[in-house]
């Protein structure tokens, strides 16, 4: 394979052509994720995969959400064989995540490259981050106008036994595939909104979690389509219903990967001093973090939502942390880990992990204090809290917070940060210039 792939950080020990022969794979989807979380791929016949593993598949980067122009040369997506997954529902095809390269250099703004760079930075400090995610989704009608199950109408539908069994064929098929892939899925449930579901699998190293997260979204959408449905991870697809979160569970392990350095039963909530410093970094950068964990205009309809039909939004709106209490931005459910409840379903799988690690690493290095612990119901008593910062009210506020957070931008890389801010500002400008019926209703006769 040559040394080139080693310097790009891709796996040169696994021969994809041999993988194809052994698994009867006819095609490979060489896939990368752009800055907006869009999954881009080329379908490559197995006969050509050896050349692709050597040289990469060519893409016009400008045609996707990257800060490139038509004048840029081809961007090469070099498959990282360590990520290859044979599609359980279409076994003659395999999916493989790619490393984006241009002019024999890494494309620094590419999300997976950004994550790998941050992971390497943490590893230099002897830290290996392991994470798990809870990617909620709705099963809706093909045209996106309504939930797909006309009988799913309960005002409190969470854990609804009848509703989850009416979608047994879809949920069980996805779970069967995760079992086949060795992900260790351990529970599936109907979530707090009508038509909403969550499926959980075992935590892993941050890059593996991001690759699985990316593939999970592809798989869920594919299986839903197979059953004549549509799956959406949109943060707030229906007014009045609970939105789609993507909660992240975080722990840090030593160089061996066997000792959880966040775990200390002698400390408050079983979270070590290093764990509290990592948490301190999350709290310190929270408002800037939102630009990436909550990356769309619609995201702020979730974290700043009024009371939903079920009685709670299950989303934070203040920068606060607590013990086993789901009304805050961060929950410490038990020793050795914490849950960040801020991210939503639109979060880019790679950037979500990258920004968590970057903020936490800064917290450890600066010995950041997470601040006061709140043990109140923020949904009922949040109005009494006057000393906790509020999360951004909209995407523009979040982008401004991110732009002003110099240390976080540096940690994620100047090229990435500049590209992300530029394209997201364009997205906000497009939204802000959109004329709405609300404006007519409230202004026509003024």
Predicted regions and their residues:
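Glycine-rich, acidic/polar active-site loops that bind/position phosphate-bearing ligands
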Residues: 2-446
């Amino acid at each position: 394979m040559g040394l080139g792939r080693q310097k790009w950080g891709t796996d040169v020990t696994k021969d994809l052509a041999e993988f194809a022969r052994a698994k009867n794979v006819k095609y490979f989807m060489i896939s990368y994720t752009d800055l907006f979380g869009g999954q881009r791929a080329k379908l490559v016949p197995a006969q050509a995969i050896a050349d692709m593993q050597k040289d990469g598949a060519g893409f016009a980067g400008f045609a996707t959400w990257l800060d490139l122009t038509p004048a840029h040369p081809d961007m090469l997506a070099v498959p990282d064989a360590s990520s290859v997954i044979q599609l359980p529902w279409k076994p003659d095809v395999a999916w493989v995540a790619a490393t984006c390269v241009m002019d024999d250099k890494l494309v620094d703004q590419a999300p997976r490259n950004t994550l790998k760079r941050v992971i390497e930075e943490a590893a230099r400090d002897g830290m290996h981050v392991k994470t798990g995610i809870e990617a909620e989704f709705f099963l809706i009608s093909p045209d996106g106008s309504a939930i797909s199950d006309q009988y799913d109408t309960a005002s409190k539908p969470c854990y609804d036994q009848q509703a989850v069994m009416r979608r047994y064929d879809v949920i069980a098929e996805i779970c069967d595939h995760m079992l086949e892939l060795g992900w260790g899925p351990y529970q599936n449930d109907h979530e707090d909104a009508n038509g909403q579901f969550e499926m959980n699998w075992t935590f892993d190293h941050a890059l593996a979690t991001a690759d699985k997260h990316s593939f999970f979204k592809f798989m869920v959408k594919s299986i839903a389509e197979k059953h004549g449905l549509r799956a959406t991870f949109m943060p707030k697809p229906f007014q009045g219903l609970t939105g789609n979160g993507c909660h992240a569970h975080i722990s840090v392990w030593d160089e061996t990967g066997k000792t959880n350095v966040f775990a200390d039963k002698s400390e408050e909530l079983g979270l070590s001093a290093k764990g509290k410093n990592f948490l301190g970094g999350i709290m310190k950068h929270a408002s800037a973090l939102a630009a990436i964990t909550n990356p769309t205009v619609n995201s702020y309809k979730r974290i700043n939502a009024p009371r939903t039909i079920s009685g709670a939004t299950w989303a934070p709106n203040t920068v606060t942390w607590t013990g086993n209490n789901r009304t805050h931005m961060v929950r410490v459910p038990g020793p050795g880990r914490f849950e960040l409840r801020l991210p939503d379903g639109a979060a880019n799988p790679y950037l979500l992990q990258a920004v968590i690690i970057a903020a936490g690493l800064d917290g450890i290095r600066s010995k950041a204090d997470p601040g006061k612990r709140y043990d109140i119901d923020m949904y009922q008593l949040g109005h009494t809290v006057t000393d906790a910062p509020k999360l951004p009210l909209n995407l523009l506020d979040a982008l401004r917070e991110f732009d002003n957070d110099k240390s976080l931008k540096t940690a994620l890389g100047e090229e990435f940060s500049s590209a992300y801010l530029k394209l997201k500002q364009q997205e906000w400008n497009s939204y802000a210039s959109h004329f709405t019926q609300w404006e007519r209703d409230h202004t026509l006769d003024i």
